[in-house]
A protein has these predicted regions:
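Long, charge-dense
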Residues: 131-149
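DNA polymerase processivity clamps
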Residues: 12, 19, 25-126, 145-258
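Serine residues within intrinsically disordered or low-complexity segments
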Residues: 3-4, 32
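Short hydrophobic transmembrane-like helices used for membrane targeting/insertion
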Residues: 1, 21-22
């Protein structure tokens, strides 16, 4: 009895017994918290897997990724609340596993993610954080943009399709003759064909060039901000579904004349 009393007195010096029980309950509730990924969130994860094959889940409603070359960074605000941290080395493989279940329920465990339904279950082991290329913790401070324009997805998609059909390796956002154009181009060949769509007006002259493979965007309309410092921000304007932001580096032969 005396020994137990001494132990409880020591506990009270740090926290009450009630607090200790609450902490214990929170701990076990964390690892038994059931959640499901919506179709929108699955689509975000599929998109992010094309940017970086790995991802680090963090507590909260934000998913983020960065390409291994650090030329693309993306962030999505999703409807689900991720309960704990967990690294996934092969995101496309995890998505494939989840597709085996008709109505997958997900639990974040200490060392793995458990995917299950009424009959089946998979324990998917987390990867070490050091194995995953992750975005910086600090939020991006985007420079004051010299150009800002809104692009409809149909126009962006049309130019990307044209680039594929015409075998053009780059997409350009250009300001010329008072218009903002999105173009499929080959900037290294001045005689190459150009496919262009007018998406706005401007009084500036510029040509910001992106590798086609770097424009890994989900099908939304976007507000595009362009900085002469070599970066562009694409922010989705959708009112329903995940809010997305992409930061994409421009190629070194981009130009801004003001």
């Amino acid at each position: 009895m005396g020994s137990s009393a001494r132990t409880l007195r020591n506990w009270r010096g740090l926290r009450t017994l009630k607090e200790a029980v609450i902490d214990r309950d929170d701990y076990f509730n964390l690892w038994s918290y059931n959640m499901k990924f919506s179709e929108d969130t699955i689509n975000v994860l599929k998109n992010f897997s094309t940017i970086n094959p790995s991802i680090l889940f963090k507590p909260g409603q934000i998913l983020s990724t960065v390409s291994p070359q650090k030329t693309i960074m993306a962030k999505a605000v999703i409807e689900e609340d991720i309960p704990a941290k967990g690294g996934i080395y092969e995101l496309s493989r995890l998505l494939g596993v989840m597709s085996l279940f008709e109505d997958a329920v997900i639990q974040f465990k200490e060392t793995h993610m458990r995917v299950q339904d009424s009959k089946r279950a998979v324990n998917y082991t987390f990867a070490e954080e050091t194995m995953i290329v992750t975005p910086p913790e600090k939020e991006i401070t985007f420079p004051n943009p010299e150009v800002e324009v809104t692009a409809e997805w149909n126009d962006v998609q049309g130019v990307l399709r044209a680039a594929g059909v015409m075998q053009l390796p780059e997409i350009a956002l250009s300001g010329k003759d008072g218009n903002v154009l999105i173009e499929a181009v080959n900037s290294k060949d001045p005689t190459a064909d150009i496919y262009s769509v007018t998406i706005g007006e401007t009084d500036k002259e510029f040509r910001m060039i992106f590798k086609t493979e770097n424009l890994k965007l989900i099908n939304y309309n976007y507000n595009i901000k362009i900085s002469s410092k070599g970066i562009a921000q694409f922010e989705s304007t959708n009112q329903v579904g995940p809010k997305l932001q992409y930061w994409i580096a421009t190629e070194t032969n981009s130009s801004y004349g003001g």
